[in-house]
């Protein structure tokens, strides 16, 4: 597979990632920050099932710091998702480079405390986490595996935008 074909495969991966992120954000993540009445009971039940099944304490009883991340997802990331979906599925949209770098760095930065919480938090002593929470290493790793793509794909995006010769910035100068 040549360089253009490889680039298109990565662009398709990124386009599908951003497309899939729209319903996940709207119907799951934002339930923690938007009024309950906006969501049909089916979506509320889906979130309850997920949080119980995967013992996700952040979506059962979201702490303030996590809600701040979700607010950023609502205000900054959600409007970017359709733009990025278009750019990557269409392909060859060099203008997406800077916004994609900003998105990837922002998203990876928010995932570090989330994944660290899942890995290192002593939930038995943490008063801020009620409800079910991961107790065993296996439960913690399962929960991390749910969130890990939201760290790994932005990392791939960042490397792709920084290293791809196609997306590198070239200064255009007027000829005299």
Curated annotation (Swiss-Prot):
Domain comment quoted from the record: The EXPERA domain doesn't possess any sterol isomerase catalytic activity. The four transmembrane helices are all kinked owing to the presence of proline residues in each, creating a ligand-binding cavity near the center of the protein.
Name of the gene: Tmem97
Main location: endoplasmic reticulum
Assembly behavior: Homodimer. Interacts with NPC1; the interaction impairs NPC1-mediated cholesterol transport. Interacts with PGRMC1 and LDLR; the interaction increases LDL internalization. Interacts with histatin 1/HTN1; the interaction induces HTN1-stimulating wound healing. Interacts with TSPO.
Source taxon at top rank: Eukaryota
A GO MF label: cholesterol binding
Membrane topology recorded in Swiss-Prot or TrEMBL: Multi-pass membrane protein
Entry's Gene Ontology cellular component terms: endoplasmic reticulum; lysosome; nuclear membrane; plasma membrane; rough endoplasmic reticulum; rough endoplasmic reticulum membrane
Intervals, Lumenal compartment: 31-68, 121-140
Transmembrane segments: 10-30, 69-89, 100-120, 141-161
BP GO terms, sorted: cholesterol homeostasis; positive regulation of lipoprotein transport; positive regulation of wound healing; regulation of intracellular cholesterol transport; regulation of intracellular lipid transport
Subcellular locations according to the entry: Rough endoplasmic reticulum membrane; Nucleus membrane
Residues binding cholesterol: 75, 77
Matches recorded under InterPro entries: EXPERA, Sigma-2_receptor-like, Sigma2_recept
Keyword Zinc: no
UniProt motif ER retention motif: location: 172-176
Positions of the record's site feature: Important for 20(S)-OHC binding and stereoselectivity: 150
PROSITE patterns: EXPERA (PS51751)
Sites marked Likely important for receptor folding: 56
Protein name: Sigma intracellular receptor 2
Domain EXPERA intervals: 10-158
This protein's UniProt keywords: Endoplasmic reticulum, Membrane, Nucleus, Transmembrane, Transmembrane helix
């Amino acid at each position: 597979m040549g360089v253009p074909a490889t680039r298109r495969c990565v662009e398709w991966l990124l386009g599908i990632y951003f497309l899939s992120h729209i319903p996940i954000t709207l119907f799951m993540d934002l339930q923690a920050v938007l009024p309950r009445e906006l969501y049909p009971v089916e979506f509320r039940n889906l979130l309850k099932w997920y949080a119980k099944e995967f013992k996700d304490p952040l979506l059962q009883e979201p702490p303030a710091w996590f809600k701040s991340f979700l607010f950023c997802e609502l205000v900054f990331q959600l409007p970017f998702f359709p733009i990025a979906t278009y750019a990557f599925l269409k392909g060859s949209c060099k203008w997406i480079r800077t916004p994609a770098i900003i998105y990837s760095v922002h998203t990876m930065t928010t995932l570090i405390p989330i994944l660290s919480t899942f890995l290192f938090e002593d939930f038995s002593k943490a008063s801020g986490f009620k409800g079910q929470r991961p107790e065993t290493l296996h439960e913690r790793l399962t929960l991390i595996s749910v969130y890990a793509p939201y760290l790994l794909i932005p990392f791939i995006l960042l490397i792709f935008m920084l290293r791809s010769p196609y997306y590198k910035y070239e200064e255009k100068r007027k000829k005299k």
